[in-house]
Regions:
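Loop-centered beta-sheet repeat module
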Residues: 214-256, 260-264
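Regulatory N- and C-terminal appendages and interdomain linkers associated
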Residues: 1-23, 141-142, 167, 180-181, ...
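A cross-family kinase active-site recognition segment
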Residues: 110, 114-160, 166-231, 256
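ATP/Mg2+ or Mg2+-diphosphate-binding catalytic cores
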Residues: 189, 201, 213, 217-220, ...
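Active-site activation/catalytic loop segments of kinase-like enzymes and analogous catalytic loops
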Residues: 290-325, 339-358
Length: 387
């Protein structure tokens, strides 16, 4: 098994029994995961190795966040503590965490009804409101009472419908979790000194230079294939769009707060029709909250041809605004910033041509078409999020 974790040494940290089987799950773009079966149950073993997110202190912060969210009833899968009480295990210079195994499946927006899209938006709003409650920034009180109200309503609804359940059969033999003391829920988390969540939008001059570089890489690629042809078409098209809209660079962003950072279909597990767990909190950080809502919708509701399902987007956005306490103007500003971000972003092509990493290639046709359609239907997209 490639990159096999040191199970013997790892499991000595936990009251999780002895390993019976360990199989890699579909690898994400950043970290590795394993389905682990032991004499005491089933677990998800996560190997954190992405340099940007694998620092033990950053992982511990993620773990504190999910533990506090779980205490509020938000559907998450907090890690199990080791014998020493820590949730991060460092073995052989590698960093691991042990989580409950959550049975469920991923669902794209096309598989959701309008009502379920509303519940999806409400869930993300609850996450943002709950993070504001359990990891407040210094001096931020906005939304605290609103967050409590909507978390209570969400968890009561989830209890009635069976949503948000976590498997308990595989829990190590530790004391049952109790609600976190109030002082934990009110302690402000430090922000990374390098964090700059209020950056202005991308500089088009930098983007034009990047487009030229990528076009040169496409021309040099041999043998040329259909991906090269599409890449060249989209790069030329994007350059023309950017020249047309170069004066629309957005100013600094609006309200910020703690966000999941990577909310998309492969980081949300459903059991039946209800969300069972939001996973992969590696990108937890302080950023504009409404922008995360827009980015998530652009992934959940994009169609293969590169258009957004606007009726579903509208149901999602209205529910998000209600539970997060976000205003229509916040969403409209976020739509503009994310549109500009997409107009200037070429991460999939950079992975392909600069790193030789093709894992994101299947996403490129729809994602690259979306910004073209979004530019043409800009007013309709804004109305779906803010109307």
């Amino acid at each position: 098994m490639p990159h096999a974790p040191p199970l013997g040494a790892l499991l000595r940290h936990y009251a999780a029994g002895s390993a019976l089987a360990c199989d890699p799950v579909d690898q994400g773009l950043l970290n590795r995961g394993y389905r682990l079966r032991t004499t005491r149950g089933r677990y998800f073993l996560k190997h954190h190795f992405d340099p940007e997110t694998a620092a033990p202190e950053a992982i511990a912060r993620q773990h504190r966040a999910t533990q506090r969210l779980a205490a509020l009833g938000v559907p998450v899968a907090p890690p199990f503590p080791a014998h020493d009480g820590r949730t991060v295990a460092v073995v052989g210079g590698h960093t691991y965490a042990l989580h409950p195994w959550i049975e469920g499946r991923h669902r794209h927006g096309a598989q959701l009804t309008a009502e379920q899209c509303g519940r999806l938006g409400a869930l993300l709003g609850v996450v943002h409101a709950s993070l504001e409650r359990v990891m407040p920034l210094q001096g931020r009180e906005r939304g605290r009472q609103r967050g409590r109200q909507w978390v209570r309503q969400w968890t009561e609804k989830g209890a009635r419908e069976g949503g948000g359940a976590r498997t308990g059969e595989s829990a190590p033999h530790t004391e049952p979790r109790t609600p976190l003391p109030a002082r934990h829920a009110e302690t402000a988390e430090p922000v990374s000194p390098g964090a700059n969540p209020a950056d202005a939008g991308a500089d088009p001059a930098t983007t034009f230079a990047l487009i030229d570089d990528l076009l040169a890489r496409v021309r040099r690629h041999r043998p040329a294939d259909s991906f090269d042809e599409l890449a060249r078409h989209r790069l030329l098209e994007r350059r023309a769009l950017l020249e047309q809209h170069v004066g629309r660079r957005p100013p600094h962003s609006g309200p910020v707060g703690w966000v999941h950072g990577d909310f998309h279909p492969f980081n949300l597990l459903y059991r039946g029709d209800a969300p069972a767990a939001i996973v992969d909190w590696d990108r937890l950080g302080v950023k504009p909250r409404a922008e995360e809502a827009v980015r998530a919708a652009a992934i959940f509701f994009v169609r293969p041809a590169g258009t957004l399902d606007l009726p579903k987007t509208r149901a999602y956005a209205r529910a998000y605004r209600r539970t997060a306490g976000a205003t229509p103007s916040e969403l409209a500003a976020a739509v503009h910033r994310v549109w500009w971000e997409r107009l200037n972003d070429f991460w999939m092509l950079r992975w392909h041509y600069e790193r030789g990493d093709t894992r994101a290639d299947p996403q490129f046709p729809a994602a690259s078409a979306l910004v073209v359609w979004w530019t043409r239907e800009y007013d309709a997209v804004c109305d779906a999020f803010a109307g």
